[in-house]
């Protein structure tokens, strides 16, 4: 390890879970967890520092996956695990892309179908509205005719029977 780190306690829960998974007691000692946490944190800092130096030697300021692979090149087990995780990550992202593309295509198809159904429904509603308008107009005409007929009856009866018709 290159330098002593502050007591970070970044991986306390993970380390205690791993200790239990490998046969330790359910609640390991805090000193044990802290010691392993410092070891893991120091190792990660060293790997990242080596990868950064590799990037600087290549005259780059940003780290790439190849820099981490180069830093792990002397440990074939860790390098193999890193490559396996990278390949798995690529598979997952490709599967998500395919899922999103098919989902987008399906939603586009659904949208088009709904739009076509909506157009058909609008046409039906327009036809319904036209028939309703015709019926309303016919109703108005019949109501108008009935009021006209009442008015003509009143006129025919004259002023004598005006009081009777109002009741």
Swiss-Prot record:
InterPro entries linked to this entry: Histone-fold, TFIID_TAF13
Coiled coil residues, start to end: 109-129
Keywords tagged on the record: Coiled coil, Nucleus, Phosphoprotein, Transcription, Transcription regulation
Domain Histone-fold span(s) in chain numbering: 10-74
Pfam families: TFIID-18kDa
Annotated Acidic residues bias: 114-136
GO MF: protein heterodimerization activity
In-chain residues carrying the UniProt-annotated modification Phosphothreonine: 131
Gene Ontology biological process: positive regulation of transcription by RNA polymerase II; RNA polymerase II preinitiation complex assembly; transcription by RNA polymerase II
Bias kind Basic residues: ranges: 152-167
Domain of life: Eukaryota
Gene3D superfamilies in the record: Histone, subunit A
SUBUNIT field: In TFIID, TAF13 heterodimerizes with TAF11, but they do not seem to form a heterotetramer like TAF6/TAF9. The 1.2 MDa TFIID complex is composed of TATA binding protein (TBP) and the 14 TBP-associated factors. One copy of each TAF1, TAF2, TAF3, TAF7, TAF8, TAF11, TAF13, two copies of each TAF4, TAF5, TAF6, TAF9, TAF10, TAF12, and three copies of TAF14.
Recorded family membership: Belongs to the TAF13 family.
Protein name according to UniProt: Transcription initiation factor TFIID subunit 13
Organism: Saccharomyces cerevisiae (strain ATCC 204508 / S288c) (Baker's yeast)
């Amino acid at each position: 390890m290159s330098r002593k780190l502050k007591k970070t306690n970044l991986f306390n829960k993970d380390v205690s879970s791993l200790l239990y998974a490998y046969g330790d007691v359910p609640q390991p000692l805090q000193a044990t967890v802290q010691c392993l946490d410092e070891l893991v944190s120091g190792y990660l800092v060293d790997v990242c520092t080596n990868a950064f130096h590799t990037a600087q030697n290549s005259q780059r300021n940003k780290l790439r996956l190849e820099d981490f692979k180069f830093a792990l090149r002397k440990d074939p087990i860790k390098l193999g695990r890193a490559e396996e995780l990278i390949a798995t990550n690529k598979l997952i992202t490709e599967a998500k892309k395919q899922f999103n593309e098919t989902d987008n295509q399906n939603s586009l198809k659904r949208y088009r179908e709904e739009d076509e159904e909506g157009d058909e429904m609008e046409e039906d509603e327009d036809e319904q509205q036209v028939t309703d308008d015709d019926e309303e107009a016919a109703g108005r005409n019949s109501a108008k005719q009935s009021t006209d007929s009442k008015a003509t009856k009143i006129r025919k009866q004259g002023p004598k029977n005006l009081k009777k018709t109002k009741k």
